[in-house]
UniProtKB/Swiss-Prot annotation:
InterPro entries the record matches: Ribosomal_uL14, Ribosomal_uL14_bac-type, Ribosomal_uL14_CS, Ribosomal_uL14_sf
Gene that specifies this protein: rpl14
UniProt keyword terms in alphabetical order: Chloroplast, Plastid, Ribonucleoprotein, Ribosomal protein, RNA-binding, rRNA-binding
Subunit structure: Part of the 50S ribosomal subunit.
Signal peptide: none
Disulfide bond annotation, renumbered to this chain: none
Keyword Amino-acid biosynthesis (UniProt): no
PANTHER family in the cross-refs: 50S/60S RIBOSOMAL PROTEIN L14/L23, LARGE RIBOSOMAL SUBUNIT PROTEIN UL14M
Any Pfam family the entry gives: Ribosomal_L14
HAMAP family, A to Z: Ribosomal_uL14
Listed name of the protein: Large ribosomal subunit protein uL14c
Keyword Ribonucleoprotein: yes
Phylogenetic classification of the source organism: Eukaryota, Sar, Rhizaria, Cercozoa, Chlorarachniophyceae
Top-level taxon in the UniProt lineage: Eukaryota
Entry's family note: Belongs to the universal ribosomal protein uL14 family.
């Protein structure tokens, strides 16, 4: 789960390396996000000479969490890190590559562009 003040690794080539979550969209008072939720974050670490700079405010989709996720068939899926992909207002990724696996639940939440760019869908 990702909540406000959580540090999240960015797994695309948009230029940011790490963001800090400041808001979870669509959750109301319960500010806990899971895989497929959109968060608002601030770039804390960025690669030089890229469009995203430190202290930029961005939208991102959570693609991996350390918290276990139970599927309908009874399988628990868990990742080693909390990771997100930076998206624009239309929920299309800003980068052109995605690094590492993403969860199959993104397909159910209609993030097909992210699923198609990912090297592995678990």
């Amino acid at each position: 789960m990702v909540q406000p003040q959580s540090r999240v690794k960015v797994v695309d080539n948009s230029g940011a390396k790490e963001i800090v979550c400041i808001r979870v969209l669509g959750k109301g008072r319960n500010q806990l996000s899971n895989i497929g939720d959109i968060i608002i974050g601030v770039v804390k670490e960025a690669i030089p000479n890229t469009p995203l700079k430190k202290s930029d405010i961005v939208r991102a989709v959570v693609v991996r969490t350390r918290k276990g996720l139970k599927r309908k068939n009874g399988i628990y899926i868990r990742f080693d890190d909390n990771a997100a992909v930076i998206v624009n207002k239309e929920n299309n990724p800003r980068g052109t590559r995605i690094f590492g696996p993403v969860a199959r639940e993104l397909r159910d939440k209609s993030f097909m562009k992210i699923v198609s760019l990912a090297p592995e869908v678990i």
